Each structure stands twice: as C-alpha cells, then as structure tokens.
C-alpha cells in the first residue's frame, strides 16, 4: 500500500468560528440545502456526531458518485480543526483503500479564515494517484467553500 499526501489552502472572508459552525458542525444540514446537486443528504449510521461516528453521504444527481461513508477521527471546536476518513463508497474506486482528510481553519490577518487541508490517499498495492483526480477533488472542495461563503455573506445572522 502506498500513501500519497496532498496539501491545499483556501481563503475566506468569513471568520473561523462562523465558518467552522457552517462547514463542519452543521454541514449535514447546510450543504444539501445550498448544493442539492452535489449532496442529496447525509445520515449518521453509528455514533453521536463526535469522533468514531460513521456517516453516509448520498450524492446529488449532478455527481458522478452515488455515496461515501466516512468516519470522524477528530473534531476540535476550540482550535477549529476536523479530521475524517473516507472508508467506503464508489469515490474510492478500485485503487484506493481509504482517504484521510485533515482540515484546520486559522484566522487570517484580514479577519477572515485560511483553510488548510491535508489529504492522505491510501492506495491498494503500488497504484499511483493521478494528478487530475487530486485536482478535481481540490476544485470541488474549493467550490463548496465558495458556496458556503456566499451563503454566509447573504445570511449575516446565520451561524453566529
């Protein structure tokens, strides 16, 4: 098994506490509402929403995938960090065993957020990860951040 690690960084005008509430703590409700073509719904299969929780995310009709299951590894509400592992679903294909994600929101000098994300792709055997697969994932994540940011700008009282 090989492990390939990729890092990415996004910026937002929204401060970390508010963005963390929307993007992490209430994403299961917010994302299907603002991007139903991407995420149809999310459900907890096991756990209470904290570390160890298993979630099933069903993608919307606009997605090339049907569903994924992920396990929450950690949530740190004080330091605005979140990690989870994608453990099942057609997004893994035949080449990936799992994908682990670590996300941390830090305050930017302008009062917004810097979103730092690290992805660890665990392959089956000696398979190499195609760069376009990683770029496509980064683009989807960036677009989702932009949708959430747009929603928060348009709803200034939400998630305060």
Curated annotation (Swiss-Prot):
Record keywords: Allergen, Pathogenesis-related protein, Plant defense
Highest rank taxon of the organism: Eukaryota
SUPFAM superfamilies assigned to the protein according to its UniProt record, in alphabetical order: Bet v1-like
GO biological process: abscisic acid-activated signaling pathway; defense response
One cellular component term from this protein's GO annotations in UniProt: nucleus
One Pfam family in the UniProt entry: Bet_v_1
GO terms, molecular function: abscisic acid binding; protein phosphatase inhibitor activity; signaling receptor activity
InterPro entries: Bet_v_I/MLP, Bet_v_I_allergen, Plant_def-hormone_signal, START-like_dom_sf
Family note: Belongs to the BetVI family.
Name under which the protein is recorded: Major allergen Pru av 1
Organism name: Prunus avium (Cherry)
